[in-house]
């Protein structure tokens, strides 16, 4: 159900297990419809690019939504306004963190690491322990395969 290769790549990087170079955030659904009410009280459907279900070793669970930043992906004032309205509806209609990610952010491994930190901090779900000494190297290698510009 991915709408773009970038969505698939981001889902892989964030949710694959550590041994495959991912950040092991949890399970992911691409473009899962979410029913909510808009600011006028109307029932609407919004579709974030990624819906990630995180859980820790004590089975605490949290949900995070991710979208590409509309100001970066769409041009034109009306489209940007519509995209921002959609984002605001998600933030107020669903009781979970919502993050916007731009293509520019994905060009920096450190930026992706920062996004993962923000996701974990916003949910209170800590990273699972690992004994892998080369974890960052594996993550950097996967990121480079998926996002590094040639």
Stretches found by the model and what they are:
Residues 1-150:
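Surface segments flanking catalytic/ligand-binding clefts of nucleic-acid enzymes
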């Amino acid at each position: 159900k991915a709408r773009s290769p970038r969505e698939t790549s981001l889902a892989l990087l964030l949710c694959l297990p550590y041994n495959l170079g991912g950040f092991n955030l949890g399970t992911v659904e691409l473009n899962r419809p979410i029913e909510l009410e808009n600011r006028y009280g109307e029932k609407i459907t919004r579709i974030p690019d990624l819906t990630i279900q995180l859980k820790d070793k004590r089975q605490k669970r949290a949900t995070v939504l991710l979208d590409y930043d509309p100001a970066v992906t769409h041009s034109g004032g009306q489209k940007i306004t519509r995209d921002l309205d959609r984002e605001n509806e998600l933030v107020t209609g669903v009781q979970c963190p919502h993050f916007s990610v731009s293509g520019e952010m994905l060009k920096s491994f450190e930026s992706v690491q920062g996004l993962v930190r923000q996701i974990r901090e916003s949910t209170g779900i800590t990273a699972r322990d690992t004994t892998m000494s080369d974890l960052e190297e594996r993550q950097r290698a996967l990121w480079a395969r998926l996002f590094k510009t040639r």
